[in-house]
Amino acid sequence: MLLSAPVNSTVRRKPHSPNKKKPKETGTAASFSSSSSTVVLSSNNDGSFDALWDPSISKASDFESSYISAKRLKPESSNRQKKKNSYKYSREENTNEVEEKTSLGSSSKTEADNIFNDQLTSAGNTTYVSNKRDVNFGANSAVVLLGLPTSKSESHRQYHSPSASTTNEDEEDIGVDILVDNHIDSCETVSINNNRGITHQYPETESDVDFDEAVILTPMDGTDKGVKNPRPLEKKYSSSCFEDRTPLNLDDGHFSECNHFSTLDVSSFFHLNEHVHKIDEVELDGPDRTFSLDNVAINTRKKDIDCLYNSSREDLSNLTCSSEGPRNDSYDSDYNIDEVTYRDDESTDEDESLPTPDRKRKKIGHKACEILDSKRIGIKVPKLYVWSLSDKPFSVIDGLCTKSLYPLSDDINTPESLSSCSSSVSSRENQKGDATFDNDAMIADLLNIGGLEVEKASNGHIELIGE
């Protein structure tokens, strides 16, 4: 931001930037402190300077001194290498206007450039943005560069203008953050004393994935100084851990982080998963969780096969009762089969008169064969004979009813049955007494039984209608 002064003051600088990238818009302040006067400069990216003068030099007393103190950097440090960076300022002051021009001799300019180039080559083959200022204030005043900006946000410089002509001051050796053309958002820090750089990767935001890549400490020269057993890939539990981590330690040249955040290696994830799977397999292989058919004994020779169902049902009930408790009482009750008791000598459809199966006979019905034709096989057609009707009222032979052959016994005779077959019985008794029993005639009579009954029923119905 340009600040207008009541006096006419113009300061120009010569831009010197090897890297063509434009950094973020920042201001550069330079203060000249001496026993008599103090000058503070503020610069922008467009190359122009804004001068804040002390009231003893000019009448610009309305500028606040708080703005100057807020832009100061750390004070001058001791025990540093002495660098010769001297600039000559010529100052011309008139009564009506103050005009400042920047001038620097060709010999002194080349010497300053050589000093900066030597410092950069000693630090390593890295991209460096120099912020040299060539300022001419006149009046034979000298300004010495005190320090470099410590970060991208703090890009202000402090200059000292003593009352003497030229003095040599210690330059503060601080790592400078430099933007590097890379596919990730990273920053290279150059340390002039240690002659090696440290790659620092900026953390991602909290909206990113939970597991982010931690800081990879890899010196630019390939050595392993200051880091013990670095891991190529490390994961952290939360991306917010970077907020509490300390920044680069510029004095030691390595990155220090707090110990209360634990890191987990990628390989440990696989080991953890393997242990979890092993625990699950051990639990499933336990005797309480397995259900096999080893406890079920199958014997095909036994008559009662309910033992198979009973044993499996008992195992199932024991497993369910031990695991779930009293909630499965109704579930187990569904499988309980109640014995059926019959009353009043009731019987089932099972034929109890059949003989028990012989255990010695392996194949049942191995002699059975299909009857295709009676003439071909040699089986005679069954004949009709007189059957005793003591146990059953009638019998079925070849699909024909034999109840009309002989009269029923006295204990089961009914008037309805007698009336229905009286005519047929009388005719057959006469035939039986007159001649011998004829099979062909009997078969013919049996085949015509249904037709005679239908004719009799129809004739009786017609007679009733005629009456």
Swiss-Prot record:
Organism: Saccharomyces cerevisiae (strain ATCC 204508 / S288c) (Baker's yeast)
Any Pfam family: CRF1
Basic and acidic residues compositional bias, start-end: 89-102
The gene coding this protein: CRF1
Record's comment on post-translational modification: Phosphorylated by CDC28 and YAK1.
Protein name: Transcription factor CRF1
Key words, A-Z: Cytoplasm, Nucleus, Phosphoprotein, Repressor, Transcription, Transcription regulation
GO MF annotation terms: transcription coregulator activity; transcription corepressor activity
Subunit structure, interactors included: Interacts with FHL1 to form a repressor complex. The formation of the CRF1-FHL1 complex is inhibited by the TOR pathway.
Function per UniProt: Transcription factor, corepressor with FHL1 of ribosomal protein genes. May be involved in the blocking of the spread of silencing.
